[in-house]
Amino acid sequence: MKPYQRDFIEFAIEQNVLRFGEFTLKSGRVSPYFFNAGLFSSGQALAKLGRFYATSLMEANVPFDVLFGPAYKGIPLATTTAVALYDHHNVDTPYVFNRKEAKTHGEGGSLVGAPLAGNVMIIDDVITAGTAIREVMAIIQQANALPAGVLIALDRQERGQGELSAIQEVERDFGMPVISIVSLNDIMTYLAEQDSPEFAKHLDAVKAYRLQYGI
């Protein structure tokens, strides 16, 4: 685990974005942890979050021409990533996002920002079922652009209905990489490093969950 990944986990815990306990997911599974990127909800938190996204993207070394933020959660994520790429890496990247409902007046259409062209890096928080990414792929194909990859905050490393995770299915179906700032393995490593009975208890619960549902 790299220092920025450890810093990100600490940051997510501080912001109450990453919590440990018992959480019932939409799938009905009872998870020992919960990750809610919507709680990165202040200027300072978003600025810091953008730096983590930008660092992950630069580390991955995947070529891209434009950032795409899927409505709604992906919009602030793509925006703060674009700002951080310029401020901290001197990379000036165009970005674009979609509206859920197309406008019929003014600038019109369902896309806002830079032209959706070339190699597109999709920015989102997590991939749970892959449904949102499939919708984005349709938008990219319609624009005759190419998917470069997906950048997310957390890879849960968890099976879907079959043997693969939603991320593995996206990589298989669309032939593009999914980059994550951290994975569940990184969270487990972080918990193991802490000298705390409480964190040790959480680690045991996460290990058991990973054995049952992990890939």
Swiss-Prot record:
Matches recorded under InterPro entries: OPRT, Or_phspho_trans_dom, PRibTrfase_dom, PRTase-like
**Domain of life of the source:** Bacteria
* GO CC, alphabetical: cytoplasm
Q: Name one GO molecular function term.
A: magnesium ion binding
**Keyword field contains Magnesium:** yes
Pathway(s) annotated for this protein in UniProt? Pyrimidine metabolism; UMP biosynthesis via de novo pathway; UMP from orotate: step 1/2
- Keyword annotations from UniProtKB, A to Z: Glycosyltransferase, Magnesium, Pyrimidine biosynthesis, Transferase
- Give binding positions for 5-phospho-alpha-D-ribose 1-diphosphate: 26, 72-73, 99-100, 103, 105, 124-132
Q: Which residues bind orotate?
A: 34-35, 128, 156
Keyword Glycosyltransferase assigned: yes
Q: Which GO terms describe its biological process?
A: 'de novo' pyrimidine nucleobase biosynthetic process; 'de novo' UMP biosynthetic process; pyrimidine ribonucleoside biosynthetic process
Catalyzed reaction equations:
orotidine 5'-phosphate + diphosphate = orotate + 5-phospho-alpha-D-ribose 1-diphosphate
Report the EC number(s), separated by commas if there are several: 2.4.2.10
| Cofactor annotation | Mg(2+)
Summarizing the function annotation, the protein's role is: Catalyzes the transfer of a ribosyl phosphate group from 5-phosphoribose 1-diphosphate to orotate, leading to the formation of orotidine monophosphate (OMP).
Q: Which HAMAP family match?
A: PyrE
Q: Which family does it belong to?
A: Belongs to the purine/pyrimidine phosphoribosyltransferase family. PyrE subfamily.
- What is said about its interaction partners and assembly? Homodimer.
Q: What is the protein's given name? A: Orotate phosphoribosyltransferase
